[in-house]
Amino acid sequence: MTPNPTPTQPSRRIAHLDMDAFYASVKLLRYPQLKGLPVVIGGSRRKMDEALQAREAGRDTADIPVDEFPRLRDYVGRGVITTATYPARQFGVGSAMGLMKAAKLCPQAILLPVDFDEVRRFSQQFKQIVTDIAPVMENRGIDEVYIDFTDVPGGQRESGLSLARLIQSSITQATGLTCSIGVAPNKLLAKMASEFKKPNGISIVQPEDLQSRIWPLPCRKINGICLLYTSPSPRDVEESRMPSSA
């Protein structure tokens, strides 16, 4: 008798989903007139924020003129940036940067406080959408998750691209927010891949892509690697690529 063939095990497909500039994007849903402008989110609530809130009374927030919003150049204090829109990032502004330092780089940026209640609400909403489609999810923060595509119907199609598109479009349709997704054989590579095509992108990394797409990246792109080790010598790079003798 001919033995029955051994069933082929599905390739492991892990996705990392990261919401794009999440805190800022939630704010832009309230103030769509700020889309495409440099906007910084951070610091505690200030008098200028209370003044903006007072101007909102009895009017559509989308109708507030852009020139009525607080500007980063007027900030004084020790607060730090929670996040910034992509137009603001083009000036070198980024998360965890002091607001006073950011004001020197992009003084014209609009400065708004975090709306924690809205952020939590949208966080719960996008995660519910994910688990409705792919139930095996690991929560990694308010704006990012890992998802196991391996055994999900459609999770192997196009190496996970089809399922990633479905999740991405479902989130955008329901919330108005965008996300970026990386799909790879493990969590480490998936997280790196989710950064490749931000914002609103999808990247697939296969084992055979390591040499061409992963090796050239600086060490700081590897999650968990010490930021102090960012400039390896050419010799270090070559030795790291040599096969182990063990």
What is the predicted role of each segment?
Residues I147-R165:
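Catalytic palm subdomain of template-directed nucleic-acid polymerases
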Residues Y229-P232, D236-A246:
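Single conserved hydrophobic/aromatic residue that forms the stacking wall/gate
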Residues S159, L163-P218:
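Long, highly charged, low-complexity intrinsically disordered interaction regions
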Residues M1-I142, Y146:
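Residues that scaffold, gate, or flank divalent-cation-dependent active/transport sites
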Residues C226:
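Short, conserved phosphate/pyrophosphate- and ester-handling motifs at nucleotide-, phospho-/glycolipid
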